[in-house]
Amino acid sequence: MSKKISGGSVVEMQGDEMTRIIWELIKEKLIFPYVELDLHSYDLGIENRDATNDQVTKDAAEAIKKYNVGVKCATITPDEKRVEEFKLKQMWKSPNGTIRNILGGTVFREAIICKNIPRLVSGWVKPIIIGRHAYGDQYRATDFVVPGPGKVEITYTPSDGTQKVTYLVHNFEEGGGVAMGMYNQDKSIEDFAHSSFQMALSKGWPLYLSTKNTILKKYDGRFKDIFQEIYDKQYKSQFEARKIWYEHRLIDDMVAQAMKSEGGFIWACKNYDGDVQSDSVAQGYGSLGMMTSVLVCPDGKTVEAEAAHGTVTRHYRMYQKGQETSTNPIASIFAWTRGLAHRAKLDNNKELAFFANALEEVSVETIEAGFMTKDLAACIKGLPNVQRSDYLNTFEFMDKLGENLKIKLAQAKL
């Protein structure tokens, strides 16, 4: 390449442990040699979050709001052991949760598929992107044990002082049981719908919303009605122009359809369904090391991309002792490519779009040519059968990717 590609503004968030080391290698070997970025860096490593009382996480989220593109390295969410290990002031919340609460939006998870990595569901030849509505329902419910006979009722008290409305949930006549009250808000469901429609348009894939509205006629019916209304008013013509579609499906029918399908669609799930199905689908594709996670905000302009896995602590402990590691960087690389691709789309930057796509192609082609990390070799051969000659270590694999990217870009005369 004769000159670097002008990449525009990107918010970059550094992370923890082995993924932090990989993150620096990605920048050094795959991004910075080719792209000139107006980079806004925030250190979300656990020590710096503690030193700033987690203000750095909030600052990073505000920066993403301002510049519309964020790329994030995996971070530690501390438990008691981590509080002790790092002598933290307190058990800081998940940075992902903090960022999501500030930005809003929906998290979409997508598998990165290589032909030579076996899938548990062999028919899935294209990704299934799961969008989880990460608000309300069971996760913000009030539940309790009913100690004995009696009535459980739910009451709505209007703010304007008009008549209260009370609903009988159940009349416990023979002993106690359990009860729960849960909720969601129209605004949150609307945001979820917009993010889902935006994602479908950006991928050019159909969108399905799954609920159980035959049983929860009012509750799940509200999700169905809001999605349909927004689709008809704002997205239907765009979908038809792209020859894609939106459909509501019952959750049980949708699960069966997904198993039989070849993939290649967006699946919008309510909170609990998304929690369960995203892990189920991830496992079906074979490896969490090959799973991207993108937060899409309802404005369709603001996106934050990251790997769907953790900080790979076990490998970091080996690295600290000077032992060889073979850590898969692919999901972290795709956090960068998805962020850069979105920047390219916002700025109509064709060179940057080509670069992001080329780096994704190189990542997949390198693995399909037989150069991979140990976790992927284990997917193919089974861990007990893996020899050292079957895989590259962390640094060898990054070098191989760098070498192949250089060749691809030279061939493209970019």
UniProtKB/Swiss-Prot annotation:
Domain of life, source organism: Eukaryota
Biological process per Gene Ontology, one example term: 2-oxoglutarate metabolic process
GO molecular function terms attached to this record: isocitrate dehydrogenase (NADP+) activity; magnesium ion binding; NAD binding; protein homodimerization activity
Reported modifications of this chain: Acetylation at Lys-374 dramatically reduces catalytic activity.
Residues with N-acetylserine modification: 2
Class of enzymatic activity (EC top level): oxidoreductase
Subcellular location, record wording: Cytoplasm, Cytosol
Residues given in the record as NADP(+) binding sites: 75-77, 82, 260, 310-315, 328
Species name: Pongo abelii (Sumatran orangutan)
Site (Critical for catalysis): 139, 212
Record keywords: Acetylation, Cytoplasm, Glyoxylate bypass, Magnesium, Manganese, Metal-binding, NADP, Oxidoreductase, Phosphoprotein, Tricarboxylic acid cycle
Catalytic activity: D-threo-isocitrate + NADP(+) = 2-oxoglutarate + CO2 + NADPH
Name this protein carries in UniProt: Isocitrate dehydrogenase [NADP] cytoplasmic
The protein's assembly and partners: Homodimer.
Species classification: Eukaryota, Metazoa, Chordata, Craniata, Vertebrata
Residues that, per the record, bind Mn(2+): 252, 275, 279
EC number(s) recorded for this UniProt protein: 1.1.1.42
Protein family per UniProt: Belongs to the isocitrate and isopropylmalate dehydrogenases family.
